[in-house]
Amino acid sequence: MELLGQKVKEDGVVIDEKILKVDGFLNHQIDAKLMNEVGRTFYEQFKDKGITKILTIEASGIAPAIMAALHFDVPCLFAKKAKPSTLTDGYYETSIHSFTKNKTSTVIVSKEFLSEEDTVLIIDDFLANGDASLGLYDITQQANAKTAGIGIVVEKSFQNGHQRLEEAGLTVSSLCKVASLEGNKVTLVGEE
């Protein structure tokens, strides 16, 4: 997605050779028009897969996921990082390690909203080592739901997340692939 790639190159801030900050349009302030295009693109890629639900994790995955859900005309469900007191019925649970925060969180999804009748598209803002996507995939498996694929907004292709997801048998669609953050510069796949 050319527009997204331009935005990553122009507004992304390289923190170090493994961390890219995109707070200006995705992780803090959200460019709604860009996220709408992200959602539309995911719809075009997965529209024939019978998607009944979009699944993501709070918080940064919500914007692209809700835009995709709008285009699919299906609910957007997000895994919570804390169990609210209102969640009294059953839930699915898994542990996810955040590469950026270097922290492991237990995330939950209510059994009320995910079942074996669902065909799920998992959407996440970043793909580094693949732990978040694999954790969400684990939740869909616990629910006996079908996973149609994984939609990633920004993939750090120099890390092993894409490979791990494919090894798990998952279809992965990354809209922007970053080849390198070396030299304090964003280099996209195809520009090396």
Swiss-Prot record:
Xanthine binds at residues 20, 27, 156. It is an enzyme of class 2 (transferase). Coiled coil: none annotated. Its EC number is 2.4.2.22. GO terms for cellular component: cytoplasm. GO terms for biological process: purine ribonucleoside salvage; xanthine metabolic process; XMP salvage. 5-phospho-alpha-D-ribose 1-diphosphate binds at residues 128-132. SUPFAM superfamilies: PRTase-like. It is found in: Cytoplasm. It comes from the Bacteria. InterPro entries: PRibTrfase_dom, PRTase-like, Pur/Pyrimidine_PRTase, Xanthine_PRibTrfase. Keywords: Cytoplasm, Glycosyltransferase, Purine salvage, Transferase. It catalyses: XMP + diphosphate = xanthine + 5-phospho-alpha-D-ribose 1-diphosphate. Pathway: Purine metabolism; XMP biosynthesis via salvage pathway; XMP from xanthine: step 1/1. One of its GO terms (molecular function) is xanthine phosphoribosyltransferase activity. CDD domains: PRTases_typeI. NCBIfam families: PRK09219.1 (NF006671), XPRTase (TIGR01744). Converts the preformed base xanthine, a product of nucleic acid breakdown, to xanthosine 5'-monophosphate (XMP), so it can be reused for RNA or DNA synthesis. Homodimer. Belongs to the purine/pyrimidine phosphoribosyltransferase family. Xpt subfamily. This is Xanthine phosphoribosyltransferase. It comes from Staphylococcus aureus (strain bovine RF122 / ET3-1). The gene is xpt.
